[in-house]
């Protein structure tokens, strides 16, 4: 099959009906950029409830690195569900959690061994990083970048600077967070080209933040996305 294969107008009638039901009972705070109602997916192909087929070029929301419904992942989920469905790793011990932490520790390129903190989402991971950075360094400040998305909980939202709608109405935010221009040469925030760039984004941190708002010794962490989301 050649994808995409579109059989109806978008969204189709079944999708429209479900979206209307959703609007009546689900929080409007969710970000739904596309009127897509998925019925099933496999690999990189996605089928909606009206039978339209799409090619997923974004791995879901950039989290399905093995594709949709990879057989090995499905088997692992079924196997775990047959053993038990919930076990709080913060309260009890679990062999699979230990094995995963051991495998991660073997991959992390740091000296002295590594320890893992498991979370349910990227937002929770960012919250944990904020706490860890401040706890370990004893420093208050964090540098993030314009255009970055780090979550919508109150701590992570202080770092997020992607869209005004994500922050509107929730301030004041956690203090100690400072934003700088993100070094995106494709869409340079100061209008330069790679051949005439003199690292102005880094200069902003050194010559603006560090000269006017804080010293480097007050920085607990720099939070950056290799590819902004």
Regions found by a protein language model. Give the residues of each.
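Short beta-strand-to-turn element immediately C-terminal to the catalytic PLP-Schiff-base lysine
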Residues: 47-48, 66-68, 158-160
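Active-site-adjacent loop/helix segments that line or gate small-molecule/cofactor pockets in enzymes
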Residues: 1-42, 92, 97, 201
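Glycine-rich loop-to-alpha-helix module at the N-terminal edge of alpha/beta enzyme cores
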Residues: 5-8, 12, 53-143
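Active-site and channel-lining beta-strand-loop segments
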Residues: 35-57
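PLP-dependent aspartate aminotransferase-fold enzymes
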Residues: 102-221
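Conserved PLP phosphate-binding loop immediately N-terminal to the Schiff-base lysine helix
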Residues: 225-229
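Conserved active-site and cofactor/substrate-binding residues in soluble primary-metabolism enzymes
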Residues: 13, 17, 41, 68, ...
């Amino acid at each position: 099959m050649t994808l995409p294969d579109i059989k109806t107008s978008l969204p189709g009638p079944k999708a429209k009906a479900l979206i209307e039901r959703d609007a009546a009972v689900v929080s409007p705070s969710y970000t739904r950029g596309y009127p897509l109602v998925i019925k099933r997916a496999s690999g990189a192909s996605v089928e909606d409830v009206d039978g339209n087929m799409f090619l997923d070029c974004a791995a879901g929301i950039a989290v399905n690195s093995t594709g949709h419904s990879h057989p090995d992942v499905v088997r692992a989920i079924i196997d775990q569900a047959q053993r038990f469905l919930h076990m709080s790793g913060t309260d009890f011990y679990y062999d699979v959690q230990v094995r995963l932490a051991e495998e991660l520790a073997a991959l992390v390129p740091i000296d002295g061994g590594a320890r893992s903190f498991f979370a349910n989402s990227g937002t929770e991971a960012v919250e944990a990083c904020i706490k860890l950075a401040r706890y370990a360094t004893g420093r208050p400040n964090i540098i993030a970048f314009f255009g970055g998305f780090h979550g919508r909980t109150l701590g992570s939202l202080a770092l997020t600077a992607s869209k005004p709608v994500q922050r509107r109405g929730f301030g004041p935010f956690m203090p100690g967070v400072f934003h700088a221009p993100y070094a995106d040469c494709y869409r340079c925030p100061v209008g330069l080209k790679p051949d005439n760039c003199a690292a102005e984004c880094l200069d902003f941190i050194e010559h603006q933040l560090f000269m006017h708002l804080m010293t480097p010794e007050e920085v607990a962490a720099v939070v950056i996305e290799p590819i902004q989301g």
